[in-house]
Structure formats: structure tokens, C-alpha cells
Amino acid sequence: MSKFVSRLLLSSALAFAMAPVAQAQTPPPEAEGVDTDEGGSDIVVIGTRRKDRSITDSSVAIDVISPESITATGYTDVNDALRTLVPAFNAQRLQGNDGSSFVRPVTLRGSPADHVLLLMNGKRRHRASIVQIGTGHASTSGSQGQDFNVIPPIALSSVEVLRDGASAQYGSDAIAGVINMELKKQKSGGSIIGQVGEYFSSGGRTYDIQGHIAVPVGDNAYFNLAAQYTDQAKAYARKATHAGAVALRAAGVPGVPEHPEGNLDPRYMAFKSVWNAGIELSDALELYTFGNYMTGKSSVTFGLRQPFAAGGLSGHGTYANSAFDLSPAHPQQFNLASVYPGGFTPEFGGHLEDFSALVGLRDQDGPLTWDLSARYGTNTVDYTITGTINASMGVNSPTSFKPGSLTQREIQFDGEISYELNDQILLFAGASHRKETYVIGEGDLASYLTGPLRDLPAGSNGFQGFSPEFAGSFDSNSYAVFAEVDADITPWWNLSVAGRYEDYDQFGTNFSYKAATRFELSDAFALRGSVSTGFRAPAAGQVFGTSLTSQLDGIGGFILDAVLVPGSPAAQVFGSDALTPETSFNMSAGVVFTGLDGFLTTLDFYQIDVDDRLLLTPSRNTTAAERAALAAINFPNGADIQQVRYFQNEMNTRVRGFDLVSTYRQEWSDNASTDFSLALNYNEQHLRGAPPPGFSPAIVTEFERGTPRWRGNFSATTKVGDFALMGRAIHYGAWRRLDGATFLPRKAVTLFDAEISYTGIQDVELSVGARNIFNIFPPGRGAARARAGLIYDNHSVFGVAGGFYYLNAKYKF
């Protein structure tokens, strides 16, 4: 506790130490995180029902990110742009982790993706179909959030990040905060952005083109279209030294895969599109619609499966049976070398589709306003796996499989009404109904079949298909009513109170509340804070989802790992219970300083307590008796499963930390200026009470220290005439990595980005830049993974492919 207090004092001192350097100059800067795009402003949509609230007079912490800031990061996806600009937000880039390679897990203030609610134009987005099984960290494993990467950045007028609990205002999932993507609402004009880039030494060349157009449709209507196409090649490690592959090649064995370690970044091709349209039916009444469609393909290469012992590595694990060993001491049932003489590296792919459509009618004129809307959303992934085998089928096995599909569908009806009693008091109320459907699509027969060689592993190796026992469609319904009062008690004191009652057909009822306030002590200083409760019902994918995958073990081989349906007969073998909702209690307090022209600083402290937190349990080894019990109930591959996991309400947790954001503009002359931006996040995560069964001291330490407590970025952008130069430093504090039962210390690291741009050609902007300009790679992760060719930590907090350079061109019309 004393260390935490000392860090709070340090951050406070840092915030106010910066103030003297800010001389009276200009209004707050157009720095990273401040919206300045046409059609956008720093008037926020989230966190308040008032129409006139900005980021400085809000009662809670909000970041407003401009599209120019997103482009300046050099990233063409929202995930990485937000990770760069908002230290409290992170998005892991994982290597070869099943579905998590396609929909990346995100966190806000250390909380997982399903504690962060994503909105578009202030309306809830549907969840992704993928449940995060392979994140490699206990705090995020098992989450089922929304996919942040299906919207073209060029479609956005701003991104608003509410860093505060908001379940009482927005419903389940808003425990840690809310992110709102506001779409452009122009009546004319448009732009095109193209980028080509590549990693310094890992390949992964990427081509990206985005376009936006506002189609003129009259003075009383708007119609905006945006689209993006991305083509990203695979990125590979610079030096793959898989011990088995080296030995196989030395022995002259043919057919050894070129990249036995798998790839760092996936192959990725995607088309994304968005529309945003509306027409005024009268002076006050507007009919509006918006939505998106995305289709894409992505693939990752898993590590080498050897045909026999080589270089000290055996073919144990998934191929533990001696029938796969080609040594003369063991009789053969099936000679793997007859199919893959040099072993094989399964290619795991997914065809992704995301669609949403919302139609609404609203009256936003006058003291009484209302909004009625209906939305539909769906997210699907169809899996494929090629270059692999179903060992139990022997020589009759195909080498390509379709393991099945996952689909998340949502339908929601929403009604809201607000009334301004006067300039000081706003009343707001609403009701909502949401239906979620989760569909597990059956795989092709060979992907899950147990063939005639019953002592060999069944199903497609690497990712086993969904059998009829696992497939099905599962529904859940929820109803909510909510209300809020926002009042300026005095000219310097604002108070808002919100409440929400929800009824879930599977998880009962809940009432959440929130109170937020702001005291303006002077024109320069304001205090703000909030207290709230939250609620999150388990997602359908967590209640019904299951999988069978091959995982690296501790000595270079593979084992069969099962994720079991909570409370199912198979999970009950290991003591699993049915799931219950999570509840939370949030507190925040902060200060806003705007006393000097061109200077803005906010400092916010927070604490989030979550009870009955839902996690994917750590993998536990099965016993012979447990495997026999699984086989007795005809669980697929029950006799061969070496590890199991399942979702469970594991423990009570506490997240505590602070955010510091400071911006300043220095005007040097009429055509020269520098914008400075500093953003810092400190975040601690702890268990409250005794750890649950299966959480060893090592796993507890990983939960609490497995991600950096410190994250920050500092940027400076200098503009001189038609040229602009941006430099950015991104800092990750020290953390610890669990490798088996051993902790590998990870030192703090700072990455540097740079970009230079030129706007001397009318309506054209050219820029060249580099991320991670010193080409820093994460450290390795243990001897077993080094022997398997994984020379970098595949769960690194800053990626594994090194530096990236790019060229951008933008045309505005």
C-alpha cells in the first residue's frame, strides 16, 4: 500500500511540475488524443447524456482520439492505434494461438476484453464469436469481447475512450470502461489513404488502401461510405533454430518444412466497409442508419510435428504412442513418414465475417428528445486446417480439414427519452431488449473421427473439429430499464446519478448504480470522481464453448488440451460448477488543470473490485482415472486428453492505478509549432482473498505481475511550413513471464517511432515513418521453446516481429 501511495504522489508531482514550462500561448493543442477532424469535436458522446460536455468538464476520464492521430501511429487498424495512443489500453499480438490469432484480446486498465464495451455511434456492438483461449495470461484468458478491428479507421470522426465503470449507463460488460467509435457524418468530400510497409527483418509486407466518400444527397440528408482493403504477408523469425528440424536436415530427411517454428504474424487479407446515413423527415425528426460488413481470411502456421526422435527431441505428446516412432525397436502400425517424411506444420486458418445494421428514428430538437432503434449483428469464423493429419485414420486420413465454425448473433431493440427541465437539470430514461445466439457449427467427419487406429490420437492434429456432441445453437435473452439524472447544483458543482435494472433469463436480475460529480474550484482547477457498481453475465461462448487443441508442453513436444463446457458431465469429473455473473465496485477520483494557455493535464486514480471473476482455469494434468472417466462418458479422445481447462467463477480481484494525460502546444512562429503529449498509466492487479484451487503461487504471481504495471508514451510533433516531424517513445515497465514453473524476468523496454510528412502538394499528404525504429525484439522464452524454434516470447506485450517501416499517401477531395 505504501508503494502505491508513493507512486500516486510521484505522478501528482510530475503533473504539476510540467505546468511551469507551459507559457501562455494558444488554445489546447491538436496533439495525439485530441480530436480536430472536420465534423468532429471534443464534445463527447459517452459518459454523459448532456450534449454540451467536453473532455475537460466531464465528471469522468475520457480520451478523444482524432483520425489524424490514428493515421500518425503508422497503424492501419484501430487495435494498434489505440494501444499506441492510450496507455491504459492494450491489444496483444499473439503468435500461433488458435482463434486468438484472428481476434486479438484487448485490455483496458488491466481488465479483459469482456469488461470493455464497444459502441459505434453510441450504440452497442455485438460480440466476436471467438473466445480467447490462448492469450497466455491468466487475467485475459477466457474472455469473449467485441472485435475492435472490423471498422476502417478512415470511417471515423473520433474514437472516445471512457476510462471508468459504466454498467449503470450502458449495461453488462462496461465494468472497466467504454470505447465509442463515432462515424463521419459529412455531406460532401472524402479522402483516400494508401500504405505499404514491411518489418525490418521479418518480412510481413503489408499493402493497405482506405477510402471515404460523402455522397451529396441534398441539404437535409447525409450518406457516408468507407472501405478498406488490407493484404498482409506472414512474418517470420530471423533465426529459426528448431533442434529437430536441424537434425532431420542433417540426416538428409526430405520434406522438412521451411519454417518449422511457425510464423510470427499471421497471413491476413480483409475487406472492411461501413455506411452512415440519415435524412431529416422534419425540422426535428431524423431517420438514420449505419452498419458495417467485413470479410477476411487469416492463417497461422503451428510448430513442427516430427516423425521420429531427432536432436534430443522425441515425438512424444500428441504423438506419444510408439507407433509413430520410426526407430527399429518399435513395430509400426502406421508410418508417418509415408505421408510427411520430414514432419509437418499445420496451417490453421479462419474465414472471418462481420456484419451489423442499425436503423433508428430520433427527435433531437427541443427540451424533450427521444431515440428508438433496432440493430442486428453477427460475427462468424469458419475454421480450416491444412497440412496436418488425423493419425487414427492412418494412410486413409486427408491432409486438409474443416473443423467447424463459431457464430455470435445479436438482436437488440432500444428506446431512450430525455427531458431538459432547464439549463441545469436533465432527466433521462430508457429500456432495452437484447437476444444473443451462439452457434457452434459441426466440423467435417474426418476432423473429429476416431479411426481404426484407436490407440493413436483422433481428429485433425493441431485443432480438432467440433463433433455433433459439441455443436449446437444456444440462446440467451436480457431485458433492461435504466434512468439518469444530471444536474448542475451550482455553477461550479455538477452531479449525475444513474441506475439500471437488468433481467437475464439464465442468470437472474441485477441493479447497478453510478454517481459522478465534478467540482470546479477555479477556472484552472477542477476535481472529479465517481462511484459505481457493475455487472457482467457470462457470454454464451463461455457457457457453451469447447475445444480440443494441441499445445506445446514443457520439453518441446505437444499434448492434447481440452476446454470443457462448465458444469457439463465432462467438467464435473474435475469439480466444475455452473457459471454465475460477475459483479464489480468502482471508485475513481481525479483533477483537471487548464490554467495556462496551450496546456491541459488530467490525473485520475481508480480502483475496480470484481467479485466472482470469470476466468479460464489454468491447465491441469489429467490422471489415468480421470481419463478413464472421460472415456466412460464417450467424451471425444477422452483417453488421450492430458490437460483440461474450463470456465469458472474463480476469485475476487482488485485493480488499482492511475492515468496521467498532459498536452501542451508551443508556438515558435506563425508557421512553426510543436505539440507535446504525455500519457502514463500505472496499473496493479491483485487477488482478494485466498487463491482458488489450481492457482499455484506461480500462477498467482503471473496473474499479478504477468503484464507491465507501467505503460506510457511521450510524443512531440513539430510543424514547420509544409513539413511535420513526429517522434514518439512508448515505454513498457518490467514484468514477469511464467515458463512452466519458472519465472523469466522481463526488463522494462522503450520503443521509439518516427514519422516525417509533407503537405506542400494541394490536397495531398505524403509521409514516411517507422515503428520500433531500433528493431527491438522481445527476449526468448525458455529452453523448450528455443528448441522448438520459438526464439522470442510469443506472448510479448509489444509483439515479436521487430521494427516496421512504411510509406503513406493521402489525398483529400
Give residue ranges: language-model regions.
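N-terminal Sec signal peptide and the immediately downstream disordered periplasmic leader
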Residues: 2-83, 114, 148-151, 214-215, ...
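N-terminal periplasmic accessory domains that precede
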Residues: 78-81, 85, 106, 119, ...
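Extracytoplasmic beta-strand/coil segments of soluble accessory domains associated
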Residues: 83-128
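C-terminal beta-signal and adjacent terminal beta-strands/loops
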Residues: 128, 610, 730-737, 758-813
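Transmembrane beta-barrel wall of Gram-negative outer-membrane proteins
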Residues: 188, 201-342, 346-368, 755, ...
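Gram-negative outer-membrane beta-barrel transporters
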Residues: 599-600, 604-739
